């Protein structure tokens, strides 16, 4: 499998989320490099990094959806929970000595691309509107308003 390449249709228009998604894709490419160089310890480190980073990304994304009052937030959270359980199973298989790198990378890339293009695009407009409203309300707030605009505007 070749290295993954960011595609413009993966942008949801919330800069911080788009940057986090790009970082996950970079990690998947690191997984590929570690696997092709036959470095099992490096593969394990990348798997741990992907899992940890993805969980923090999900928590951040879910907080944004909740704050924006996104009506399908609970369903979106359940999708995240199922994904985390699935990846945890791969992690256990790896720890048991199984070579799951290709299978995991394929599953992760397909899932991520489909999730961004579907589930994440679905909440983007509502979250952007909420963030823009918040920034407008706090625009005179100096640093906070500028920071919010930089990250979310």
Swiss-Prot record:
Fe cation 2 binds at residues 61, 76, 80, 115, 120. Pfam families: Hemerythrin (PF01814). Fe cation 1 binds at residues 21, 57, 61, 120. GO terms for molecular function: iron ion binding; oxygen carrier activity. Coiled coil: none annotated. The keyword Translocase does not apply. Keywords: Iron, Metal-binding, Oxygen transport, Transport. It comes from the Bacteria. InterPro entries: Bacteriohemerythrin-like, Haemerythrin_Fe_BS, Hemerythrin, Hemerythrin-like, Hemerythrin-like_sf, Hemerythrin_metal-bd. Belongs to the hemerythrin family. Monomer. Oxygen-binding protein. May be involved in a storage mechanism or for delivery to oxygen-requiring enzymes. The oxygen-binding site contains two iron atoms. NCBIfam families: bact_hemeryth (NF033749), hemeryth_dom (TIGR02481), PRK00808.1 (NF002007). This is Bacteriohemerythrin. It comes from Stenotrophomonas maltophilia (strain R551-3). The lineage of its organism: Bacteria, Pseudomonadati, Pseudomonadota, Gammaproteobacteria, Lysobacterales.
């Amino acid at each position: 499998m070749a290295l993954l390449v960011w595609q413009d249709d993966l942008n949801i228009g919330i800069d911080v989320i788009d940057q986090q998604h790009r970082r996950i894709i970079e990690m998947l490419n690191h997984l590929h490099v570690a696997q092709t160089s036959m470095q099992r310890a490096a593969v394990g480190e990348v798997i741990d990094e992907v899992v940890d980073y993805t969980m923090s990304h999900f928590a951040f994304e879910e907080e944004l959806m909740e704050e924006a009052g996104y009506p399908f937030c609970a369903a979106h959270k359940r999708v995240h929970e199922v994904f985390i359980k699935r990846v945890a199973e791969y992690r256990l298989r790896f720890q048991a000595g199984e070579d799951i790198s290709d299978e995991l990378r394929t599953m992760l890339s397909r899932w991520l691309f489909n999730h961004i293009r579907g589930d994440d695009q679905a909440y983007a407009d509502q979250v952007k509107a909420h963030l823009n409203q918040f920034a407008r309300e706090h625009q005179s707030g100096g640093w906070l308003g500028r920071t919010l605009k930089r990250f979310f505007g």
